[in-house]
Structure formats: C-alpha cells, structure tokens
Design a protein with these regions (language model features):
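Enzymes that bind and transform nitrogen-containing heteroaromatic metabolites
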Residues: 1-133
Length: 133
C-alpha cells in the first residue's frame, strides 16, 4: 500500500494490485487483496479486470512484477524464479525500506545492463536479471 501511495496513481496498461492487511480505499480499476498469494491469484484471473480496463491492459500471463515494499519483496523472493532488479549506486541516508540481501548461493546473475546515470539525480544505476540456481 505504501509503495502504491508513493506512486500517486495507477500505473498505466497493467493491472495494479495492492497488498494490504488493513484494507485500502483504492481507485476504480485497482484491486486490493490481503496477501501475496491473493495478489498472484488476482493477477491470473481475468475476471478481476474491470471491463473498461481489459482492452487497455497489456497482459503478461507468466510474469508478475512486485514493486515493494520490503516484506513483500522477501515473500516474493521465496517463490520467484527470476528477479529484475534496478541497482542504484548510492546511499540514501534516510531510507526506510530495503531490498533483502540477494543470496549468491540461491541466485545467479543472468544479465547485467551497462551503467546509466539518472539526469535528474545524477545517481548511477544498472538493471540486473537474476535467475534461481
């Protein structure tokens, strides 16, 4: 829920699912569930799509993208076969959410992008795809 609130509005052309144990008054077209398991079930059930959205949503039947927070990341890592991670090469002093440690005995680097620089912040970052060993 907190991650969704930080984004401010639903991400376009996809089904947005919020996982919240406390419930959440989400805008139309956003699905709210109690657990990660329910989120995966909602993602795979086309009946969860409001008819107005169904023609606009790009479907990825075999992929779910988890965008936070820390507890959800840790749960998703236990069942994922692949992770696409943006590594930002900086330290944020007042950060309150951290991605769990990626255990090299479980995950291997399958692909790594070149290092990019964000023009607004000046932070260097790269995209790394990990696959389960």
């Amino acid at each position: 829920r907190k991650t969704y609130e930080s984004i401010v509005r639903p991400l376009p052309k996809r089904l947005n699912i919020i996982v919240s144990r406390k419930g959440y008054d989400a805008p139309e077209g956003v699905v709210v569930v109690d657990s990660l398991e329910e989120a995966f079930a909602a993602a795979s059930a086309t009946s969860t799509l409001p008819s107005a959205l169904s023609s606009e949503v790009e479907t990825y039947p075999e992929k779910c993208f988890v965008i936070g927070g820390g507890q959800i990341y840790a749960q998703a890592m236990q069942i994922a076969d692949e992770m696409v991670i943006t590594h930002v090469h900086t330290v944020i002093e007042d950060a309150d959410t951290y991605f769990p440690v990626i255990d090299p005995s479980i995950w291997q680097v399958a692909e790594r992008s070149e290092i990019h620089t964000d023009p607004e912040t000046g932070y260097n970052f790269e995209f790394v795809t990990y696959t389960r060993k």
